[in-house]
């Protein structure tokens, strides 16, 4: 089974990925695939460089490009593991591509939803170099994500976690949903 993890920036995808890793379930990051591709092409891993690589691979391979890039790694992992998680799916075309590339695998989409204000605060605190510095930058980034089609992926998810309360409640919700996904799909 392949679990496609999606959510707006700062929604809590990283925490969900950590929970899967703790259970020994491998997690492949779509963002890492772009960073690796940038390195291969000798392009700096700055926000501008990564955006360029992201657009370039989509131009070369189509809208499901990142799914194509990580497919070999996924195929390898699925030889040893019943379940693999893909973190950072952003468009319906990527979901489509995974279904095409892995026709014999059960594919489930898990979305994390969190209100904009909470996501903005979280992103400010984590301090990644590509995180927005102002509310306007944050709204701009959200607009770009929504233009990719992430809203549609979230809306059509098989499972949803709403991260709008305490961190403890979020962690409990993660555990519950992971158990539900693994139980119902390994019967």
From Swiss-Prot:
Residues annotated as binding ATP are 7-14
What single Pfam family name could you report for this chain, choosing any that match?
AAA_17
Q: Which UniProt keywords apply?
A: ATP-binding, Nucleotide-binding
One Gene Ontology MF term: ATP binding
As given in the record, the signal peptide range reads: none
InterPro entries for the chain? NTP_hydrolase-rel, P-loop_NTPase
**Family in the record:** Belongs to the UPF0200 family.
In terms of PANTHER family, this protein maps to: DEPHOSPHO-COA KINASE (PTHR41930:SF1), UPF0200 PROTEIN MJ1399 (PTHR41930)
Provide the protein name: UPF0200 protein PYRAB09750
| Organism of this sequence | Pyrococcus abyssi (strain GE5 / Orsay)
